[in-house]
Amino acid sequence: MIIKPKVRGFICTTTHPLGCERNVAEQIATTRANIPESERDKGPKNVLVIGASSGYGLAARVTAAFGYGASTLGVFFEKPGTEKKPGTAGWYNAAAFDKFAKAEGLYSKAINGDAFSHEAREKAIELIKQDMGQIDLVVYSLASPVRKLPDSGELKRSALKPIGETYTATAIDTNKDAIVEASVEPATEEEIADTVTVMGGEDWELWVDALDKAGVLAPGARSVAFSYIGTEITWPIYWHGALGKAKEDLDRAAGELDARLGQHGGGANVAVLKSVVTQASAAIPVMPLYISMVYKVMKEQGLHEGTIDQLNRLYRERLYSTQGQNGELATDEAGRLRLDDWELRDDVQQACQDLWPQVTTENLFTLTDYAGYKREFLKLFGFERDDVDYEADVDPVAEFDVVQL
């Protein structure tokens, strides 16, 4: 079929299989350029990525496999394509990853199902025992609006809302490319609690606990989960909002898991990453405008990093750095690995603060990198690539080495 982008709200409802494959190939090429052959043996060897099909989770898997030659098992929840309808971008990303990894002679296997379920954990443990033995890195990168509690089956939903008072700010209506005033009502106590349940550290702990009890964690195994803190511009909706409470719970879990894994010479950390265009960030009010501003400023200063650049740096300069003194990782006072350091530079943030009140619908494309934001957004779904002929017929069915739960 011939597939064109169809955007509804902050989701593109169509995806392009070849475009997604080229995106993954590009991440692999970047990784090879960033991580020298001489450092290949310094990284992880057997890696489990929970939330492995898009965004930072996909980049974590690409970095492990193509930067360090690791065997990888990916867990995600995606929809396969059919003859009549394209699948989700994550499905095609995972299919492309599998194809490229196998061509390289690397072990690659995936589980498609609810990563919050006990069943997913059991299947992962079974595959690790059968194929990998033990794993030395567990990457936790789930971003989901809903979590089905594994014991009761109860559904909990996360809320992207402020706490205490209504938050009103300048934002972009991405459907109309217009600057609007966006207001978000504050979260109720129940919504805050549910957001912590969905996006907090509980499920990360359940995963590490299950892996540990099953004996599939290698001595010295590490685990990392991803977070974002941001700055004053996004704090009301993010760090000081319901989502921030969930991310604080992630910090709590990291402390518990660090103590547990530390008994065998390993450890756990939250990695705080920079803001990038992902399906997750597109859903957060104010983020598209903030990202459009910060991309422009950081590109002008030669500091811009995409998703894969961040993950390459996380592995190379933080998790597996040769600079680490006696195995100590360079963290902030809360034990977090900070990769938002360039974004949080005073000059970068001041430039964004100065830009923010000036942006109007008329100057949106000139004052900010909103054009770049839109392009990156569509690229997530396989569109806007110069090396793909979008008038050509493409097969929406992609089969690969995946266990369907």
From Swiss-Prot:
Entry GO MF terms: enoyl-[acyl-carrier-protein] reductase (NADH) activity; NAD binding; trans-2-enoyl-CoA reductase (NADH) activity
Chemical reaction(s) catalysed: a 2,3-saturated acyl-[ACP] + NAD(+) = a (2E)-enoyl-[ACP] + NADH + H(+)
Complex formation: Monomer.
Active site positions: 238
Species this chain originates from: Chromohalobacter salexigens (strain ATCC BAA-138 / DSM 3043 / CIP 106854 / NCIMB 13768 / 1H11)
Site (Plays an important role in discriminating NADH against NADPH): 78
Superkingdom as given in the UniProt entry: Bacteria
InterPro entries assigned to the protein according to its UniProt record, in alphabetical order: Eno_Rdtase_FAD-bd_dom, Enoyl-CoA_Rdtase_cat_dom, FabV-like_NADH_b, NAD(P)-bd_dom_sf, Trans-2-enoyl-CoA_reductase
Annotated pathway: Lipid metabolism; fatty acid biosynthesis
Broad class of enzyme this protein falls into: oxidoreductase
Organism ancestry: Bacteria, Pseudomonadati, Pseudomonadota, Gammaproteobacteria, Oceanospirillales
Keywords: Fatty acid biosynthesis, Fatty acid metabolism, Lipid biosynthesis, Lipid metabolism, NAD, Oxidoreductase
Matching Pfam families: Eno-Rase_FAD_bd, Eno-Rase_NADH_b, Enoyl_reductase
Primary role: Involved in the final reduction of the elongation cycle of fatty acid synthesis (FAS II). Catalyzes the reduction of a carbon-carbon double bond in an enoyl moiety that is covalently linked to an acyl carrier protein (ACP).
GO BP annotations, alphabetical order: fatty acid biosynthetic process
Entry binding sites for substrate: 228
EC number(s) on file: 1.3.1.9
Official protein name in the record: Enoyl-[acyl-carrier-protein] reductase [NADH]
Signal sequence, renumbered to the chain: none
Binding sites annotated in the UniProt record for NAD(+): 51-56, 77-78, 114-115, 142-143, 247, 276-278
Family per similarity comment: Belongs to the TER reductase family.
Coiled coil, from the record: none
